Amino acid sequence: LSVTAAAVYYVLRCLLPDETPNCAGALELLELAAPEGCLVNALSPAATAAGNVETSQRIVDVVLRALAEVLPQRIPAASQGTMNNVGMGSADWSYYETLAGGCGAAPDSDGRSAVHSHMTNTLNTPAEVLEAHFPVRITRYARRRGSGGNGRWRGGDGLEREFEFLAPAEVTLITERRVHAPWGLDGGNDGSRGENLLDGQPLPAKITVEVQAGQRLLIRTPGGGGFGTSGL
């Protein structure tokens, strides 16, 4: 429930005036309806490991989309909606990172490209640092141009990051927006869905897989949705 509350509070705090203090009083009129045992108020022994990184993103998207019906000129299109969690390692080493993507376009501006958005708090890992400490080589790290949705205001682009494994490893992916694209608003187009590719072959959004030395994993993160009809 704490993740659910944080995600809802985050959205509402973004809509409040800047001078509003960060305190319980600012949100005292908010009532959360999340019955015990439901998806957003899970009880032990339910698995909740990805709640803070993926479920929180879904909650933010749902609340923003609902508010867009009543605040159409204040709500942005959907951002990438995932943290693109990548974990890898073996008995001798382990590494975990999250990958940025596109932000949704706002009613008056383009979305930002290749950045984390909403419920996130992680920094970019330089390729040089990763390669210096682990048997992994970064063969591509670039903006995924054209992945943001078209519109009067364009969604931000995602990014591409490719890992070449120099030793056998186990890889776990916890990602979203591989089936349903980040939505556009007010006639704007959806952003591109994310993709996970191992040696060019698609992988599902969530998987644990064994890889061998020489194999390559390419992550293409989602673009943000566009806002408004293009050309108007």
Regions found by a protein language model. Name each.
Residues 1-232:
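Glycine/proline-enriched, intrinsically flexible loops and inter-domain linkers
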